[in-house]
């Protein structure tokens, strides 16, 4: 097993709109024996446990956090990206030797933008997952399309009698994207959620 990692972090403060910037990146390389994964079998709600033998995993995780302030308005932006190559190296004679393991994308990422003003919070999030395969062989029959989705939420926070009241309205899958996290299990189209919480 081999591991490599690096991290960079910055904490930049300024009197103008730009307040803070954090950057980080981590690289890794692992060889894992008897890696167990779960993936959906032929029947609905039934998952199969699979021992992959030996898996070679290389990857990079990177993130960026930025904070801005414009008078009473505060803004935060967070970006994340992952590249991961996880391949089965158990037996060179296997047809799936050095194929990407099931349901692990090579590319994935997210972006979140938030604006806060006098107890109000507006948040937008975008999630992307790249192409994957539903079984050990990386063939067109097992190909799973990339997917992405956007969510939007509005939150109001009130302090009443030393208690914190939070009301949130969410729009999930804002643009009605058709996508499947798991093959043949379509996710909901645009949907809504309202919630209220009280912190005593």
Per-region residue spans from a language model:
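Membrane-spanning beta-strands of outer-membrane beta-barrel proteins
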Residues: 1-3, 9, 55-59, 106, ...
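Asparagine-centered polar/low-complexity signal
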Residues: 3, 50-51, 138, 173
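Residues on the lipid-exposed face of transmembrane beta-strands in outer-membrane beta-barrel proteins
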Residues: 4-8, 62-66, 79, 111-115, ...
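Short polar/acidic secondary-structure junctions
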Residues: 11-13, 69-70, 159-160
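Gram-negative outer-membrane beta-barrel transporters
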Residues: 16-32, 48-133, 175
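Flexible, surface-exposed loop regions and adjacent strand-edge segments
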Residues: 39-48, 92-100, 129-130, 139-144, ...
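C-terminal beta-signal and adjacent terminal beta-strands/loops
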Residues: 128-136, 143-145, 151-200
